[in-house]
Design a protein with these regions (language model features):
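Canonical Rossmann dinucleotide-binding motif of NAD(H)/NADP(H)-dependent dehydrogenases/reductases
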Residues: 1-11
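The beta1-alpha1 cofactor-binding region of Rossmann-like NAD(H)/NADP(H)-dependent oxidoreductases
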Residues: 18-19, 40-53, 84, 203
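Conserved Rossmann-fold SDR core element
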Residues: 63, 152, 162-176, 218-225
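Catalytic loop of short-chain dehydrogenase/reductase
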Residues: 73, 113-163, 175-176, 229
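Substrate-binding pocket helix/loop in short-chain dehydrogenase/reductase
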Residues: 78-79, 83-91, 190
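A short, exposed helix-loop element centered on a Lys and neighboring polar residues
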Residues: 102-103, 156
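C-terminal substrate-recognition "lid" of short-chain dehydrogenase/reductases
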Residues: 201-225, 230-231
Length: 242
């Protein structure tokens, strides 16, 4: 909705939530007057991933200028329980799919232009939704964390490889929405125990997207919108030391 309000035509990817995606498309069309389409794909199947950018471009009638890699599998495992299935599901959805989409996106972005000062202006922007935990590692969610660490590396290396015509950045949310398997008490404790004593809200994630859309000189960066969760330092090895 935010992107449509800023003048973008929007392609929405979904896997199983067809009804919700269709409702969002109709809302965007009715409230903003911008074109929008919903496209189904299983991001663990590369053949479906490879077609997404082309399908979106054809449906919207032109090249795609902004790619937001937001879809993610987030399931618990640890060093003892991680197996081939959990590894593949997390790597395929959180790392392989963004790589393939990045490749497809880069192949269709219009040629670079220059501003009035003769300096190049990027014509494409990729935003990868990562996780603040790449800045604050724990032994929990092993496959997920490794996949997101890989996506952070991909963000930086693709920013190098695709410059100057495409900028690539990342956003690392903290406790924003309660997880499906998370208790209300645990979620509230997560939020209040950040450095700022508060979590983030969806509107703040959107604000970070807005900043990256406008910041023509920013690439290869990670913005943690997490209440400072990644800076948490009150651990047993520090507390009580004078």
């Amino acid at each position: 909705i935010f992107l449509a309000e800023r003048g973008f035509e929007v392609a929405i990817h979904y896997h199983s939530s067809e009804s919700s995606a269709d409702k969002l498309v109709e809302y965007i069309k009715s409230k903003t007057g911008k074109n929008s389409v919903a496209l189904r794909a299983d991001l663990t199947k590369e053949v479906e991933v490879r077609e997404l950018i082309t399908r979106a471009s054809e449906k919207l009638g032109g090249p795609i200028s902004c790619l937001i890699n937001n879809a993610s599998i987030f399931e618990y495992d640890n060093i003892w329980t991680a197996n081939r299935e959990s590894w593949d599901r997390h790597i395929e959805s959180n790392l392989r799919a963004p790589l393939v989409l990045t490749q497809s996106f880069a192949n269709q972005v219009p040629s670079i232009i220059s501003d009035d000062n003769g300096e190049p202006v990027s014509q494409g922007l990729i935003i990868n939704l990562i996780d603040q935990r790449v800045k604050k590692l724990t032994p929990e969610f092993t496959s997920y964390t490794i996949a997101k660490m890989g996506l952070w590396a991909l963000t930086q290396t693709s920013a190098q490889a695709l410059a100057p015509n495409i900028r690539v950045n990342a956003i690392g949310p903290g406790p924003t929405l309660k997880g499906a398997r998370q208790s209300e008490e645990h979620f509230e404790n997560q939020r209040k125990n950040t450095v700022l004593g508060r979590g983030s809200d969806p509107s703040e994630i959107v604000a970070a997207v807005g900043y990256l859309l406008n910041a023509k000189s920013v690439t290869g960066q990670l913005i943690c919108v997490d209440g400072g969760q990644h800076l948490a330092w009150k651990t047993p090895d520090v507390l009580g030391v004078e």
